[in-house]
């Protein structure tokens, strides 16, 4: 997760609609009367200030896909990513959804169903089917992760897991259906994105290794040497230098751990990245 998933959209995609709109959609989906649209006061934690009513379109900053009164905001774009891919994907999915809705509505009308009745029936069916994606709570909470799993929502925790779905047949069908991207174009983009990820992680690994070997380890060894001399001097002057020796041993264990970690990192960054682009990216991730 970027920034630990606590300062960025969570990996589980959900849609925030707000209490008022969610109540209306649930009423349509399940044939119930919608609750009133009165807003609750904001909980600002200051008793001397008057109650401030919450705007019905008050934003949920933890939602990756939020309705903010007159528009939806898609917030799951990576900081280094171009917005084009997200826009292409969203528009392709929207085109397919509208095409499906139009086909279902035309089929109902062809059977003689009145327009308003067909629309109401279709809306109720679609809203009920897609209610699992609607969530107005805290998208960062562990409770939401458990609830999302119950709802059957995917939780793609890393880049490689997400890019692996580029080649899914149903995903490629969405882009191919309206001539946006062919399967071959989808696979080529998947290959490029996986290679970019692998190279980025490899560069980061080699950089960390160089910093550890040339900047951190020499300082740690110099400090260890100073402690060794101090402990040796203390032992020569007094009978009880156990504390100095114990501290030296603690630092030495940390330095040994650093050296071992650097050796492990070196073996990893110089290891075999062979195989498919997906396998190489998975190796880099792991």
Regions found by a protein language model. Give the residues of each.
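Acidic, glycine-enriched catalytic cores built around paired aspartates
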Residues: 1-286
């Amino acid at each position: 997760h970027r920034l630990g998933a606590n300062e960025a959209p969570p990996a589980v995609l959900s849609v925030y609609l707000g209490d008022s709109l969610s109540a209306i959609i649930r009423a349509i989906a399940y044939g119930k009367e919608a609750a009133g649209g009165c807003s609750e006061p904001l909980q600002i934690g200051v008793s001397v200030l008057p109650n401030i009513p919450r705007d019905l379109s008050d934003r949920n900053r933890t939602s990756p896909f939020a309705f903010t009164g007159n528009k939806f905001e898609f917030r799951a774009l990576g900081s280094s990513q171009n917005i084009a891919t997200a826009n292409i994907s969203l528009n392709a999915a929207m085109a397919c959804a509208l095409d499906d809705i139009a086909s279902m509505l035309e089929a109902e009308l062809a059977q003689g169903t009145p327009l308003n009745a067909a629309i109401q029936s279709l809306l109720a069916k679609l809203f009920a089917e897609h209610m699992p994606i609607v969530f107005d709570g805290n998208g960062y909470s562990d409770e939401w992760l458990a609830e999302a799993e119950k709802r059957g929502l995917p939780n793609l925790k890393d880049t490689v897991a997400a890019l692996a779905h580029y080649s899914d047949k149903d995903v490629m069908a969405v882009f191919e259906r309206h001539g946006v991207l062919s399967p071959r174009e989808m696979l080529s983009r998947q290959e490029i994105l996986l290679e970019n990820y692998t190279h980025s992680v490899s560069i980061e690994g080699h950089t960390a290794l160089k910093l550890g070997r040339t900047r951190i380890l020499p300082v740690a060894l110099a400090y260890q040497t100073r402690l060794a001399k101090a402990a040796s001097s203390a032992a020569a002057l007094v009978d009880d230098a156990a504390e100095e020796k114990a501290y030296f041993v603690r630092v030495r264990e940390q330095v040994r751990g650093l050296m071992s970690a650097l050796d492990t990192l070196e073996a990893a960054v110089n290891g075999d990245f062979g195989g498919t682009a997906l396998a190489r990216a998975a190796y880099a991730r792991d």
